[in-house]
Amino acid sequence: MRTCLVVDDSRVIRKVARRILEDIGYEIAESADGVEAMAWCRAAMPDAILLDWNMPAMSGIEFLRGLRAEPGGEAPVVVFCTVESDLAHIREALEAGADEYIMKPFDGDIIAAKLAEAGL
């Protein structure tokens, strides 16, 4: 079974994302910030990461840059899922190594399509 790490400081968003991803066949882990997510990835690199931008301790973009520098960190498909909708944020995320970028609010069809487009 494929694994997805949902990284968002909102428990509600994590719960909604968990339900959507479990319905399409993913095993889910959750992290509330980038620091916790990095520790999780070092212990067990997931197949995919659904990532928020604005979080305490370490932002999503800081996490992504750190992840891509880790051994095996190039492997997970990273989908930013955030309220940041301007072109500068999208460009920065893609240049840092994000595979896809979606805006909140999101639904199951969008998440499934973006993961499929990224090869999962």
Identify the function of each model-found stretch.
Residues D33-E36, S59-R65:
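Acidic catalytic/metal-coordinating carboxylates
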Residues K15-D23:
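Charged docking surfaces used in two-component/phosphorelay signaling
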Residues E62, S85-E100, A113:
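Alpha4 helix (beta4-alpha4-beta5 surface) of REC/receiver domains from two-component response regulators
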Residues K104:
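A Lys-centered signature of the CheY-like receiver
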Residues A44-L50:
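Active-site beta3 strand of CheY-like receiver
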Residues G25-A32, W40:
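Short hydrophobic/Thr-rich beta-strand motif most characteristic of the beta2 strand and flanking loop
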Residues M55:
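Receiver (REC) domain active-site loop signature in two-component systems and cognate sites
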